[in-house]
Amino acid sequence: MLMETVLVVGGSRGIGKATVKSLTQKYNVAFTYCKSKEEALIIKKNIPGSTAFFCDVESMESVEALKNLCYERFGKIDHIIYCAGIAESRLFVDLTEKDWLRMQNININGLFRVLSVFLKDMVKRKSGSIIAISSVWGIVGASMESHYSASKASIIGLTKSLAKEYALSNIRFNCISPGAIYTDMLSKFSEQELSDVANDIPLGHIGDASDVVSGILFLLNNNYVTGQNVVIDGGWTL
């Protein structure tokens, strides 16, 4: 039996990188990078079974080129994990239209482009699954991160809508909303700030990327789960 192929969009850092590392024993893994080519080449070198492709999710042409490369190499894509995203803190009244649009263009419009390019073939095969990384801020909102929160809420809404739309095509859509996770996005926090965050979490500590990967593996392997937003936050949003 041929191994299925997983495409991890935004797989050179953080949760995406941890996902790539965890999947190569069971799947062929393609992952994308944009501004972190050096990190991507290191991953490709150190993780047998992984293939790195450049992709700028802000460009439909780049996503279409990605599909061509994936199909030349693997013939098809069975699962897509969308980890691409950016975050920043800023008061709403200080946001420019450019700030707002760039956030949406990567976090949600990038997902739209990837699905626009890859989904039709999944529908023809009546097989596939998509997992997108959202955030707890997409559920409860975050002060000074309105543009980020809006983009992540959009991922949850899109996931639920497409899960209904393509259920009869045997394509599953799910998303994961992590809470505080040790990735680059927390790298600017001081030790005191990290301690304060941990104290607000019922389980008493900040999560690791592997905690999110566990959720991804569950969603990949359970064929009876669709339309779900899996919250992995140590109880933070209770």
Where are these regions (language model features)?
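Conserved glycine-rich Rossmann-like NAD(P)H-binding loop of the short-chain dehydrogenase/reductase
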Residues: 27-41
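Alpha-helical segment proximal to the catalytic Tyr-Lys
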Residues: 120, 164-168
